[in-house]
Amino acid sequence: MAKPCGVRLSGEARKQVDAFRQNLFQEAEDFLCTFLPRKIISLSQLLQEDSLNVADLSSLRAPLDIPIPDPPPKDDEMETEQEKKEVPKCGFLPGNEKLLALLALVKPEVWTLKEKCILVITWIQHLIPKIEDGNDFGVAIQEKVLERVNAVKTKVEAFQTAISKYFSERGDAVAKASKDTHVMDYRALVHERDEAAYGALRAMVLDLRAFYAELHHIISSNLEKIVNPKGEEKPSMY
């Protein structure tokens, strides 16, 4: 029977791995002790901003510089295709500046939470002990916490997809409104997309704050088992 092959690192490689672990544990400690509480407070303050408390959603509407064609006169009904008047073309159509400004605030927050989830996942994975017989209750807790953090990360990734989808759907609506300029419903659809996006962005910030609060609760409540799953040593972040 072949002997198991152990993984051996050179002295320099071992130093680099150890340095990475130490930096990882330090980042995790800073995240839990400093970053998390401050982020919950800062998101609460962001939710109090006027930009996230718009009562009249119609005020969010961006002007659509799309000319509305005049109705054809009765004597034009029998004219040939060559004789028909051209539909006036629209020029440059910018995005909704109010929504773009709000996106500039929310998008970095989404990215930050995703990166922090990756940090926590990597940290806990480095704390999982050698698999062997014995008391694995602490390991089970580590796995449960990892499962929940991964779930949060998945939801945050869905936020990123939703932001991209907003631009795609709004772009389609604007394209239709500029092509079929006589159909007012397409213009209304553009405004509807903006109003829906505003509500979604506010909900995102609420969810981001809730996710941070959940991470703080689930990690702090189970910190002893996370950092010391076997209960053999004094619990430590390191």
From Swiss-Prot:
Residues 65-86 are annotated as: Disordered. Pfam families: PA28_C (PF02252), PA28_N (PF02251). One of its GO terms (molecular function) is identical protein binding. GO terms for biological process: antigen processing and presentation of exogenous antigen; regulation of G1/S transition of mitotic cell cycle; regulation of proteasomal protein catabolic process. It comes from the Eukaryota. Keywords: Acetylation, Phosphoprotein, Proteasome. The keyword Acetylation applies. Induction: By interferon gamma. The modification N-acetylalanine is found at A2. The modification Phosphoserine is found at S10. The keyword Phosphoprotein applies. InterPro entries: PA28_C, PA28_C_sf, PA28_N_sf, Proteasome_activ_PA28, Proteasome_activ_PA28_N, Proteasome_activ_sf. Implicated in immunoproteasome assembly and required for efficient antigen processing. The PA28 activator complex enhances the generation of class I binding peptides by altering the cleavage pattern of the proteasome. Belongs to the PA28 family. Heterodimer of PSME1 and PSME2, which forms a hexameric ring. This is Proteasome activator complex subunit 2. It comes from Rattus norvegicus (Rat). The lineage of its organism: Eukaryota, Metazoa, Chordata, Craniata, Vertebrata. The gene is Psme2.
